[in-house]
From Swiss-Prot:
Full protein name: Glutamate N-acetyltransferase
Coiled-coil region list: none
Principal subcellular localization: cytoplasm
Species name: Methanopyrus kandleri (strain AV19 / DSM 6324 / JCM 9639 / NBRC 100938)
Family: Belongs to the ArgJ family.
Subunit note: Heterotetramer of two alpha and two beta chains.
Protein role: Catalyzes the transfer of the acetyl group from N(2)-acetylornithine to glutamate, forming N-acetylglutamate and L-ornithine.
Length: 387
């Protein structure tokens, strides 16, 4: 595994502070999607402005301090950081994306972050080691790295993400960086990214809490000398984006704080896509459903209640609810309660990956969402961690 052509990465973690750098040897077209939380962090405001201009040269990420709800001082910290990293990279400061993750209400120690960034810069590179060092540097409560790679014919797309708690994006803390060496226009990148994020990152939930710092950034530097639309088909590039983002989204949920099971919610038979998405997210977000999954309890009534609470069109006489895993499938409701084998249901739900399949019985639209179970360990982690 290597970074796409022309990208260099690195990272360091020390004294509870992580610093990661991404640098492109060529200027990049850039696109981004960001949290809709009304108390957005200062770096989100800055990075969205960079993405709106459509050109970037580098990224700095710090973990440990979210720099959210920190007022004007926090925004000045972002500008100071961007200025220092721009000087380091030999780029304009308005081409530096700045991202932060960590404790809300805490300003970042800019001088220390810049000092660590200079150390990272001395050993920045494209190898698997450099990619993994960046990935580890941006982690907070994560227990696993989240990396995905798509390799095309003469080009590639690398995705690196972090996130384990406060995951209920609308684009937890969730950060994702997508790097490709194909060429593309910023407006096209923004359109493709928005569509893919809506079907992947915006359909995951760990705890229903939307962070102040959620950011997904896509950088395309054209170093492969291949362009989307002429050398690489738009269809293939969109497929690559979807595959990488889907893999990252699943890894985030699988690594949810305290999680023991990945939940995949598949909703079919909805009247339209909006309602399918709403129903899928409602099920994946339900604490009662998540707790039942942890207990390996086939409590289909909680799923039905979540669907009803989503205010979507559903035909009770056609409604179907089933659980599916590597251990088999069990139907629990089909126009009415179904007598099922409780022992088989327990086996189906004992798997580490469980699908909840729901047919609303009113149309042809479908959607998919990802979630995880709710465990005692989640409560312990968040009782002790200051968000």
């Amino acid at each position: 595994m290597r970074a796409p052509e022309g990208f260099l990465l690195g990272g360091i973690k020390r004294e509870g502070i992580g610093v990661g750098l991404i640098f492109s040897e060529r200027r990049c077209a850039v696109a981004g999607t960001f949290t809709e939380n009304t108390l957005r962090a200062a770096p989100v405001e800055h990075s969205e402005e960079v993405c709106d201009r459509g050109v970037a040269r580098g990224v700095i990420v710090n973990s440990g301090h979210a720099n959210a709800m920190t007022g004007e001082e926090g925004y000045q910290d972002v500008l100071r950081t961007a200025e220092a990293i721009a000087e380091l990279m030999g780029a304009p400061e308005d081409e530096i994306v700045v991202c932060s993750t960590g404790v809300i209400g805490e300003r970042p120690p800019v001088d220390k972050i810049v000092r660590y960034a200079r150390e990272v810069w001395e050993d920045i590179g494209p190898t698997e080691r450099h990619v993994r060092e960046f990935s580890r540097a941006i982690m907070t409560t994560d227990t696993e790295e989240k990396i995905a790679l798509y390799e095309g014919d003469g080009w590639s797309l690398l995705g690196i993400a972090k996130g384990a708690g406060m995951i209920h994006p609308n684009m937890s803390t969730m950060l994702a960086f997508l790097l490709t060496d194909v060429g593309a226009k910023p407006k096209e990148l923004q359109m493709w990214l928005r569509d893919v994020v809506n079907d992947t990152f915006n359909m995951i939930t760990v705890d229903g809490d939307e962070s102040t710092n959620d950011s997904v950034v896509l950088l395309a530097n054209g170093s492969s000398n291949l362009k989307v639309g002429s050398d690489v088909t738009i269809t293939e590039f969109q497929r690559a984006l979807e595959e990488v983002c889907t893999e990252l989204a699943e890894k985030i949920v699988r690594d949810g704080e305290g999680a023991t099971k990945l939940m995949i919610v598949c909703v079919h038979g909805a009247s339209n896509e909006v309602e399918a998405r709403r129903a899928a997210r409602a099920i994946a977000s339900s604490n009662l459903v998540k707790a039942a999954l942890f207990g390996e309890n086939p409590n289909w009534g909680r799923i039905g209640a979540a669907v009803g609470a989503a205010r979507v069109d559903v035909d009770p006489d056609e409604l179907r609810i089933a659980f599916r895993s590597s251990e088999g499938e069990i139907v629990t409701y089909e126009g009415g309660p179904v007598d099922f084998d409780e022992e088989k249901a327990k086996r189906v739900l004992s798997a580490s990956e469980v699908e909840i399949v729901v047919d609303l019985g009113v149309g042809d639209a479908s959607a998919r969402a990802w979630g995880c179970d709710l465990t005692y360990e989640y409560v312990r982690i968040n009782a002790e961690y200051r968000t």
